[in-house]
Amino acid sequence: MRKNRTYSLLVAGSLLLFIGGLFCLPGEITVSNNVYGKELPIQSVETEEKKAVLTFECAWDHSSLKDILEILEDHNVRAAFFVTGDWVKQYPEDVRRIVQGGHDIGNHSATHRNMVQLEKEEIEKELKETHQAVKELTGKEIKFFRPPYGAFNDTVILTAKEGGYLTVMGNIDSMDWKDYGAKTILRTVMEDKELQEGSIIRLNSEAKYTKEALPKLIESLEREGFRLVPLSQLLYQEAYHLDVKGRQIPDDR
């Protein structure tokens, strides 16, 4: 009896391994943000080209946005703007200008709440509200998510993933929100030891000195050989994994 039971267990185990193998065939698309059992956001991207991305968070004010968009246009640079649902509702024309300028739009939640403090259903609601608001205005589907305050845990990232989002933070923080001045913003970014191919640079559209620092920041990055591209042209949408620093690496490397 015990022998038959052992045999049955072995057969069942082999069958499970076989079925599992069907879903892990070589060449299958895989996407993993899990590193040593913890879900991580994308911080930067492994790339042979010297590319980087400027990303802006839009949650409160919009007074500098027009100037920022003009500066980007003057320098022929496309960036990414992470917007909250409240901001979208308050400044719909700015959302349209962002999209018309060829920039990427990202989800920054609906109300800029700390996602870690929310239940899964509340996180889903925050994401859906912003997604729907942007889609109704522009017809665009959002693919990227940045949690407010840089606060995340496994639930936040997995919930975003279930909604079709890549969670993106950034390995270079300009600290422009501290309002120390344009020169400090420039120095903070350009002297960061993590600045490299595939860097994602974080800025705030409403910070006091961001628009003043932006022209010199773009020129300094380009002088160092960086090509500034939209987020959608840098990130891998599939077949990738992350290292311990959140660097996105294609599975064939």
Task: Please tell me what each predicted stretch does.
Residues 8-25:
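Hydrophobic membrane-insertion alpha-helices, especially the h-region
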Residues 53-55, 79-83, 104-107, 143-146, ...:
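Structural recognition of the beta-strand scaffold that forms the well-ordered cores
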Residues 30-114, 118, 122-126, 131-133, ...:
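Active-site beta->alpha N-cap acidic-glycine motif
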Residues 26-28, 36-48, 74-76, 87-89, ...:
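C-terminal domain-boundary segment and adjacent tail
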Residues 62-64, 113-141, 151-197, 210-213:
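Alpha-helical scaffold elements lining the catalytic groove of polysaccharide deacetylases
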Residues 95-97, 121-123, 183-186, 242-247:
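Short low-complexity, flexible loop/linker segments enriched in glycine and/or proline
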Residues 1-6:
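N-terminal Lys/Arg-rich, disordered targeting/topogenic segments
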Residues 59, 84-86, 110, 150, ...:
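Active-site beta-loop-alpha junctions enriched in small/polar residues
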